[in-house]
């Protein structure tokens, strides 16, 4: 008898077949890609830029290194890493979603970021790169959309060089009850309305709120990273735990 729990996963609060989730997530990001950056600024009041700056500072990236910006979307981190690694370095912006990758490529080329950046459509669960290839991997607000998170973490571990580090920047669990209540009210009542006004799509932003609630909390994700092989795993809470930055090393 087939264990149905092994064949299903969550899409927001809904239970769906595992082989259907990737397509459903793809539709969300096809819908929002064109105004993704605008919506990030509106939804976070611009604070996402600070969260990403913290991640960049924690990356330890240096000139000449090879970086994977996984689920890199419109290229915010890639743009910064491109300047840091310089001409002899390389940044790979990888995303499973063709629409997001197209927006990211056009955005970076429009501001003259070329030469040391390449673009790859890739599934985090089966990364198409050699073993021990990257000095640093970042995945920013992308892991919660992955169907098989454990599989993706193992794939990241495989392609990371010994001595390299993984940084996972993701929405997490607020630390304080009053903040959690206010955050819930904002997420479930305000975000969908913003989505409806600016991209005529309340459903995608309802999914965003639900997917955040279904994502593992800080300590659970830390354990998942350790089980995938990462060592010295730590995390830093930001904005009261609304976002957490996890960091782990491969030795």
From Swiss-Prot:
Q: Quote the Pfam families the UniProt record gives.
A: Ubie_methyltran
Q: In which pathway does it act?
A: Quinol/quinone metabolism; menaquinone biosynthesis; menaquinol from 1,4-dihydroxy-2-naphthoate: step 2/2; Cofactor biosynthesis; ubiquinone biosynthesis
- Keyword annotations: Menaquinone biosynthesis, Methyltransferase, S-adenosyl-L-methionine, Transferase, Ubiquinone biosynthesis
- Return the PROSITE patterns for the record: SAM_MT_UBIE (PS51608), UBIE_1 (PS01183), UBIE_2 (PS01184)
InterPro entries, alphabetized = SAM-dependent_MTases_sf, UbiE/COQ5_MeTrFase, UbiE/COQ5_MeTrFase_CS
User: Mind listing the GO biological process terms from this record?
Assistant: aerobic respiration; menaquinone biosynthetic process; methylation
Please tell me where S-adenosyl-L-methionine binds in this chain: 74, 95, 123-124, 140
Read off the SUPFAM superfamilies from this record.
S-adenosyl-L-methionine-dependent methyltransferases (SSF53335)
Residues forming coiled coils: none
Per the UniProt entry, the disulfide pairs are none
Recorded GO MF terms: 2-methoxy-6-polyprenyl-1,4-benzoquinol methyltransferase activity; demethylmenaquinone methyltransferase activity
Family assignment from sequence similarity: Belongs to the class I-like SAM-binding methyltransferase superfamily. MenG/UbiE family.
- What PANTHER family does the record tag this protein with? 2-METHOXY-6-POLYPRENYL-1,4-BENZOQUINOL METHYLASE, MITOCHONDRIAL, METHYLTRANSFERASE
User: Can you name this protein?
Assistant: Ubiquinone/menaquinone biosynthesis C-methyltransferase UbiE
Organism encoding this protein = Photorhabdus laumondii subsp. laumondii (strain DSM 15139 / CIP 105565 / TT01) (Photorhabdus luminescens subsp. laumondii)
Highest lineage ranks of the organism? Bacteria, Pseudomonadati, Pseudomonadota, Gammaproteobacteria, Enterobacterales
């Amino acid at each position: 008898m087939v264990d149905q729990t092994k064949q299903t996963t969550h899409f927001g609060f809904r239970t769906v077949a595992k082989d259907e989730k990737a397509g459903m997530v793809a539709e969300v990001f096809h819908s929002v890609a064109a105004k993704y950056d605008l919506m990030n600024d509106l939804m976070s009041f611009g604070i996402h830029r600070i969260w990403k700056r913290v991640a960049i500072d924690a990356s330890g990236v240096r000139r000449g290194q090879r970086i994977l910006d996984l689920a890199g979307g419109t290229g915010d981190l890639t743009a910064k890493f491109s300047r840091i690694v310089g001409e002899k370095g390389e940044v790979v912006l990888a995303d499973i979603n063709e629409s997001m990758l197209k927006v990211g490529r056009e955005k970076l080329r429009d501001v003259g970021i070329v030469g040391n950046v390449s673009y790859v459509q890739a599934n985090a669960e089966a990364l198409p790169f050699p073993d021990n290839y990257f000095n640093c991997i970042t995945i920013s607000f992308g892991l919660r959309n992955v169907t098989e998170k454990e599989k993706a973490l193992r794939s990241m571990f495989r392609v990371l060089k010994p001595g390299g580090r993984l940084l996972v920047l993701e929405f997490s669990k607020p630390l304080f009850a009053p903040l959690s209540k206010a955050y819930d009210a904002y997420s479930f009542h305000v975000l969908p309305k913003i989505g409806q006004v600016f991209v005529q799509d309340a459903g995608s932003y309802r999914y965003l709120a639900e997917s955040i609630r279904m994502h593992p909390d800080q300590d659970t994700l830390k354990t998942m990273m350790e089980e995938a092989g990462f060592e010295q795993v730590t995390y830093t809470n930001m904005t009261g735990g609304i976002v957490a930055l996890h960091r782990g090393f491969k030795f």
